Amino acid sequence: MRTHGLTLLSLLLLAVPMLLVEAKKEGRNRRGSKASADESLALGKPGKEPRSQPTNYPIKGKFVTPDHADCRWAVTKQEEGIVLKVECTQRDNTFSCFFTGNPTSCLELHKNNAYWKQIGRNLRSQKVICGDAKSVLKTRVCRKKFPESNLKLVNSTLIRIKKPSQELMEPSPMDTVEVTTSSSPEKTQTMATKDPQCEEEDLKNQRKAALEYCGETWGSLCNFFLSMVQGSSC
């Protein structure tokens, strides 16, 4: 019995170190797998930057201006940038205008909804919609870093109607030159026609005075002196 118990004890003493070594190896493997998983997750997070969803065109909206014009707007995409068309009705008048810009770079980093909401607010706050040639639609999310995202007015039916009327009302400089040059020959002609009449009246007056003061005998001599002394009455 004693020999059997001693053999069992010796076997247990030999097995314990082996079990401890296996347990340490298994613990190391678990720690290594967990660390590698955490490292892969940690490396994967900063590599992916959050980006907004691509814009689905056309984008549409409606608004009412401070001067009670009912308007609607729609955005279409071009090869470079976008075009925003505004159509309004005020009483019996209808007018429209176009804005252009390129917010593509800004929309890749910011939310589309924020940008288009600010564009809609800017349209509603316009004092004279489609009537100011210097009108620019700006947004707080893009205008500092992306100035090309500002939408500028490029065409308007209101501004195009004003120009022809101004050109018709203003006379051209060629018209004024023709009037002045055509009137000058008439003046010279009237001046030239007045000279013979003036000379005939002077001669008649001189002859009358010579006959009254000098008589018929000395009339011709007096007439000669009077023509030298008296000037033309004209």
From Swiss-Prot:
Residues 178-192 have a biased composition (Polar residues). Keywords: Cell membrane, Disulfide bond, Glycoprotein, Growth factor binding, Membrane, Secreted, Signal. Residues 25-59, 169-200 are annotated as: Disordered. Residues 194-234 are annotated as: Sufficient for interaction with FGF2 and FGF2-induced effects. Glycans are attached at residues 155, 172. The keyword Membrane applies. It comes from the Eukaryota. Residues 1-23 form the signal peptide. GO terms for molecular function: growth factor binding. InterPro entries: FGF1-bd. It holds the Pfam family FGF-BP1. It is found in: Secreted, Extracellular space; Cell membrane. Coiled coil: none annotated. It is a peripheral membrane protein. Its main location: secreted. One of its GO terms (biological process) is positive regulation of blood vessel endothelial cell proliferation involved in sprouting angiogenesis. GO terms for cellular component: extracellular region; plasma membrane. Disulfide bonds join 71-88, 97-130, 106-142, 198-234, 214-222. Belongs to the fibroblast growth factor-binding protein family. Found in a complex with FGFBP1, FGF1 and FGF2. Interacts with FGF1, FGF7, FGF10, FGF22 and HSPG2. Interacts with FGF2. Acts as a carrier protein that release fibroblast-binding factors (FGFs) from the extracellular matrix (EM) storage and thus enhance the mitogenic activity of FGFs. Enhances FGF2 signaling during tissue repair, angiogenesis and in tumor growth. This is Fibroblast growth factor-binding protein 1. It comes from Bos taurus (Bovine).
